[in-house]
Amino acid sequence: MTKVGLRIDVDTLRGTREGVPRLLATLHRQGVQASFFFSVGPDNMGRHLWRLIRPRFLWKMLRSNAASLYGWDILLAGTAWPGKNIGNANAGIIRETATYHETGLHAWDHHAWQTHSGHWSIRQLEEDIARGITALEAIIGKPVTCSAAAGWRADGRVVRAKEPFNLRYNSDCRGTTLFRPLLMPGQTGTPQIPVTLPTWDEVIGPAVQAQSFNTWIISRMLQDKGTPVYTIHAEVEGIVHQPLFEDLLVRARDAGITFCPLGELLPTSPESLPLGQIVRGHIPGREGWLGCQQAASAS
């Protein structure tokens, strides 16, 4: 049996309002639990449209047919009008999710984090994280114990900024296996659970067709030599491609794959995890930099 961590990122108002309820129903039907990471502040995702002047981002949008994939309400959110507060508008849905699934913070403002966190000070990072955690805890009525950086925009500064919040784990980068981030010689931070597998929007296009994606990603899960972690998005697999996602759950189970919340991947003694660090890097299919796992030594 292959155990795969299932991470669900919720970036937008529509993803929360429409995608999450469908995903909850899908997961219930298939007897699967996952980790949901919510954006709880303003939905300003439409402000990413200026990135269309960048060739790699434009190609990604064309390759994934973004207008039909996400919908124009997502692509234009927060452009001509102030972005609506996601958490306030969908508190009931978020609370219901937290009743049945592991629930953590994705971001206060997904667009702001993805655009500006790379040059924020440690203090600015801490303030933004605190704002998101405070809002999410007020909604779910219990402590937030995990987080996942929006767009995998994370480096050593982000690791340090999250330390005061005493989280059980973070999922801030791409990599191969769980690790303890090295803060300084002799001091390690909160365990990291990297995403190891590509997302739909990173690979769909000429190389992998939509109708063959499930076969392709299941093969990648079974071949993963580390600790497999797969990310879906409420805006994609919860709306337009919900039937394909449910088919993936069925076919994965038949292939001997069991999905689980990321927290279940943690060992009893996190001290046994290898050391590592998060550095800025690039991966195929994703525009811009993101956090990538790198080995580190204790010396």
UniProtKB/Swiss-Prot annotation:
Question: GO biological process annotations for this chain's record?
Answer: 4-amino-4-deoxy-alpha-L-arabinopyranosyl undecaprenyl phosphate biosynthetic process; lipid A biosynthetic process; lipopolysaccharide biosynthetic process; response to antibiotic
Reactions catalysed: 4-deoxy-4-formamido-alpha-L-arabinopyranosyl di-trans,octa-cis-undecaprenyl phosphate + H2O = 4-amino-4-deoxy-alpha-L-arabinopyranosyl di-trans,octa-cis-undecaprenyl phosphate + formate
Record protein name field: Probable 4-deoxy-4-formamido-L-arabinose-phosphoundecaprenol deformylase ArnD
What is a single molecular function from GO for this protein? hydrolase activity, acting on carbon-nitrogen (but not peptide) bonds, in linear amides
Domain NodB homology, which positions?
Answer: 2-260
Q: One GO CC term of this entry?
A: membrane
- What species is this protein from? Salmonella gallinarum (strain 287/91 / NCTC 13346)
| Function per UniProt | Catalyzes the deformylation of 4-deoxy-4-formamido-L-arabinose-phosphoundecaprenol to 4-amino-4-deoxy-L-arabinose-phosphoundecaprenol. The modified arabinose is attached to lipid A and is required for resistance to polymyxin and cationic antimicrobial peptides.
A Pfam family of the record is Polysacc_deac_1
Enzyme's top EC category? hydrolase
Per the record, the pathway is:
Glycolipid biosynthesis; 4-amino-4-deoxy-alpha-L-arabinose undecaprenyl phosphate biosynthesis; 4-amino-4-deoxy-alpha-L-arabinose undecaprenyl phosphate from UDP-4-deoxy-4-formamido-beta-L-arabinose and undecaprenyl phosphate: step 2/2; Bacterial outer membrane biogenesis; lipopolysaccharide biosynthesis
Provide the alphabetized UniProt keywords: Antibiotic resistance, Hydrolase, Lipid A biosynthesis, Lipid biosynthesis, Lipid metabolism, Lipopolysaccharide biosynthesis
What family is reported?
Belongs to the polysaccharide deacetylase family. ArnD deformylase subfamily.
In terms of domain of life, where is this protein from? Bacteria
Q: Its Enzyme Commission number?
A: 3.5.1.n3
Q: Does the keyword Secreted apply?
A: no
InterPro entries, A to Z: ArnD, Glyco_hydro/deAcase_b/a-brl, NODB_dom, Polysacc_deacetylase_ArnD
